[in-house]
């Protein structure tokens, strides 16, 4: 589905980014993997190459405009174009779980500023290259916090809602140039270390164990289970392919029914 497509993945060393990278590679994409720290990204790239795929690793801070721009230009120089931009960055989970009325403004603003800046920079700089080719796909990743009222998550909900709004606005501007912009909204996959850290802290603040909290989340889904990284990666492949050519300006609900559209 993605044979010879050139894909840039941000946060490729993390759970979501690495799963999507492997799925893209299986479908024939040429991968340029990035992360703030090179070592975990290099592990993923070597695994893909050893399996017969095409992948290069680079250390890129997705909050640094110059770093992102320089890397994208290097991709253009090597591959001639950028077909897919997939951003799966994460930020450390705040250790303090307090009500919004007690939350420090800097802690509240951190996820909002971080996620919106990264998604804006990576999308804008990729789009500038894609416009020249008249095609491309930009994929964002959010969470159900964008649509639910959830206590003790600080600026997480507003950050996710902002990224989804950015997804729609980018699509409105870029679709006439042949560029699709779509989002993926999982509820949270316990396979990832980031989710374990985030939900684990939330479980502790709620007075339950991590296992009990997972059971609670699963009980709220239609399937009575949480989604997996493989399921999300498969959807990412579809959304990045021409099979999803009719989809743009939308966010795919991967909440297993816990969030009704």
Predicted feature descriptions by range:
Residues 13-14, 37:
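Conserved glycine-rich cofactor-binding loop
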Residues 29-43:
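Conserved glycine-rich Rossmann-like NAD(P)H-binding loop of the short-chain dehydrogenase/reductase
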Residues 91-92, 105, 111, 139-163, ...:
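Catalytic loop of short-chain dehydrogenase/reductase
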Residues 96-100, 104-109, 217:
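Substrate-binding pocket helix/loop in short-chain dehydrogenase/reductase
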Residues 97, 225, 237, 248-261:
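Short C-terminal tail/terminal secondary-structure segment
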Residues 128, 172-173, 245:
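Alpha-helical segment proximal to the catalytic Tyr-Lys
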Residues 175, 180, 247-249:
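Short, small/polar-rich loop/turn modules that mediate ligand/substrate recognition or access, typified
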């Amino acid at each position: 589905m993605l044979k010879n497509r050139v894909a840039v993945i941000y946060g490729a060393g993390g759970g979501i980014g690495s799963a999507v990278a492997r799925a893209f590679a299986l479908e024939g994409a040429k991968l340029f993997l990035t992360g703030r720290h090179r070592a975990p990204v290099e592990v993923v790239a070597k695994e893909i190459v050893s399996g017969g795929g095409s992948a290069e690793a680079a250390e890129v801070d997705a909050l640094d405009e110059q770093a992102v721009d320089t890397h994208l230009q290097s991709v253009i120089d090597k591959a001639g174009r950028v077909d897919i931009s997939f951003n799966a960055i994460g930020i450390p989970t705040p250790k303090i779980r307090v009500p919004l009325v007690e939350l420090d403004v800097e802690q509240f603003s951190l996820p909002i500023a971080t996620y919106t800046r990264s998604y804006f920079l990576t999308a804008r700089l990729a789009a500038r290259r894609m416009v020249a080719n008249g095609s491309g796909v930009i994929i964002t990743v959010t969470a159900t916090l964008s649509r639910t009222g959830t206590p003790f998550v600080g600026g997480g909900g507003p950050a996710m809602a902002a990224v989804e709004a950015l997804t729609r606005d980018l699509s409105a501007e870029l679709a006439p140039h042949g560029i699709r912009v779509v989002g993926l909204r999982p509820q949270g996959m316990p396979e990832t270390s980031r989710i374990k850290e985030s939900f684990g802290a939330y479980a502790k603040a709620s007075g339950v164990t991590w296992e009990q909290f997972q059971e609670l989340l699963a009980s709220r889904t239609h399937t009575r289970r949480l989604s997996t990284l493989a399921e999300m990666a498969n959807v990412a492949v579809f959304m990045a392919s021409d099979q999803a050519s009719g989809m743009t300006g939308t966010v795919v609900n991967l909440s297993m029914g816990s969030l009704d559209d």
